[in-house]
Amino acid sequence: MIPTKEQAWDLLCEYNEGEFHRLHARIVGDVMRYFAVQLGYADEADFWQTVGILHDLDFEQYPDQHCTKEAEILREKGVDERLIHAVVSHGYLLTVDVQPEHQMEKVLYATDELTGLI
């Protein structure tokens, strides 16, 4: 199952109460949508946005298990492995050894860091 951006937002809010984390998720989702269109993946813009929204799903409640706990949560919810790989890969070399492979995953890796500075 691939959640819609609305379902992704609701799921994010289940695990994140802080305004900063919610705002960060929204910004990363919007930036991911922008780059999907710019890089020729307009037909996947919703998916890219959903990945951006969910990328830090576990961070507020499980900072010491960031990315690994998220994979558990998403698998329990029946989320598609492609989405799980994408969100987990943004923690490459920090918390996990899942390497970003697809262009979308590489964009997420960079976008997460850059939007965190804003």
Describe these PLM feature segments.
Residues Y41-I118:
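Divalent metal-dependent catalytic cores for phosphoryl transfer on phosphate-bearing substrates
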Residues M1-Y62:
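Acidic/His-rich, divalent-metal-binding segments that scaffold phosphate/diphosphate chemistry
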